[in-house]
Every structure is written in structure tokens, then in C-alpha cells.
């Protein structure tokens, strides 16, 4: 059995150790075992998390993250990873059991993310009796051969995001555009500022659609992952500005920006049951690449 310890905060050595484990898992599996939000919570001073470390023979064998802030539906959210060299020894089951116990102690339900929908995760879910409740598709296309950017609605212009000026407006539009979404709709100005400090942040690739009074109507936040891959990180349009083609224009303008930086491919995330969005992205040349699955008990 592994030695399990809970931590409300991590020291730099623990954070570095966890980062190495996550990198090992991603290299072997071809998919990151945890989402971006978990990586941000590894930073000094980050709050709202319970970190679970599993050690075996003095080695960090596994890591689990419990998001105590949860989603907008009142669920705690869990993600876990097992070091490749420590797999098939029950570490994943021990981590999952401890996460379930921690959620029960808090009197809250918990959801588990399985990134990449890998066989090991689905097997663990089956042993726990968990059911699939969400599937988040990753859709992808090449940046070559993009459709033309359609004209913007009358009176609307595009400009780049300005740090220190636009955070509150982005949060306002985001909350209205994603009021239905368990995670995205909860984004705060502090979340935006935290991501501004990331190496990948590029204000020129954060496109804002504004009216004549500079009131924000929508935005396309792009992200560069490496020398070849970009991401449609978030596209949000105020409900009052929807229906006039602004979302499509913003999406394509962001793709053109990513292509101009020398990238070859782009991906995005979309709920599998959001049929209208899937149809829009399919018409824009995207196709399903892989999926992340969320489980509940």
C-alpha cells in the first residue's frame, strides 16, 4: 500500500515533484493527466485545493487533486495521475478511495475527470461503479485553407485585449455567455490575471469585439501550446449580441491570428452534447480528435 498524505498547500519541492510526475505520465500516455486548472493550483499561494500525495518506497507514486471550490452544480471535482512505473499496483484505486472519503467528509458529491478517456481510467471507473456523465470533445483542424473571415456586424470592431483594463468586461461577458457551463461560467478577474502571468499569454491573440462606445460584445482568447499547435481557448459572445454572425467572425479571426504566428494546427474543446456548437465547428473544418470524460458515483 502507498503512504497517502493530504496537503492544503504545497512547498516548492512538492510542486516540482508533482510536475515531474505529471510530465512523465503525459509523455507515456500522449495526453495530460490533469487539466490546466490543476497546474495553476500547484503555484505558491494558490488556494481552494486539497492535494493528495501517494508515496511508495520513498518515490512519489501518484497524485490527486480535489477542487474544493467545485463547479457551479455544487460538485467537488477530482483529477488524479499515477506515475507510469508505479501502475498496476493499486495506487489509482487508493487515491480514488481517499478522494471519495474526503468528499463524503465534506458532505458533497464528487466528479472525476479522465483526460483522454484511456483504458486505465475507464477500468478504474468501472471498479468504482462510476457512470459517465459528461464527455468533452477535443476537435482539431489544420490551419491551412481557412475560410475567409466574414464581415463584422455593423458598428463592431476588433481590438486586442489590454491587461489592467479589460478583465472585468471579459468576466461580465463570459458569465453571460457561459451561464449554463459548470466551469467556464465561474471565471473571475483573478483567474484572468493569473493566466496573464503564464508564458503562453499573448494579448495580441486575445481578440475583443467592441461597439462604437468600446462596450465589449464578444471575445476570442487564443492559446499557443508549442511550435505547431494552437487552441481556440475561449470564444464568448454576449447573448444580446448573438445571432448576427459575430461568433463565427471572432472564431475565424482568431484562427487567422494563430496561423500568422506560424502554427500548423489548432484544437478546441466542446461539450459532446452541444449539438449546435459541434455542427458549427464541423462546418469550420474541425473533426473529433479525442475526448475527456467526467464520471460520477
UniProtKB/Swiss-Prot annotation:
1D-myo-inositol 2-(L-cysteinylamino)-2-deoxy-alpha-D-glucopyranoside binds at residues 36, 183, 223, 231, 269. GO terms for molecular function: mycothiol synthase activity. Acetyl-CoA 2 binds at residues 235-237, 242-248, 274-279. CDD domains: NAT_SF. It catalyses: 1D-myo-inositol 2-(L-cysteinylamino)-2-deoxy-alpha-D-glucopyranoside + acetyl-CoA = mycothiol + CoA + H(+). Its EC number is 2.3.1.189. The keyword Lipoprotein does not apply. Keywords: Acyltransferase, Repeat, Transferase. It holds the Pfam family Acetyltransf_1. Monomer. Belongs to the acetyltransferase family. MshD subfamily. This is Mycothiol acetyltransferase. It comes from Actinosynnema mirum (strain ATCC 29888 / DSM 43827 / JCM 3225 / NBRC 14064 / NCIMB 13271 / NRRL B-12336 / IMRU 3971 / 101).
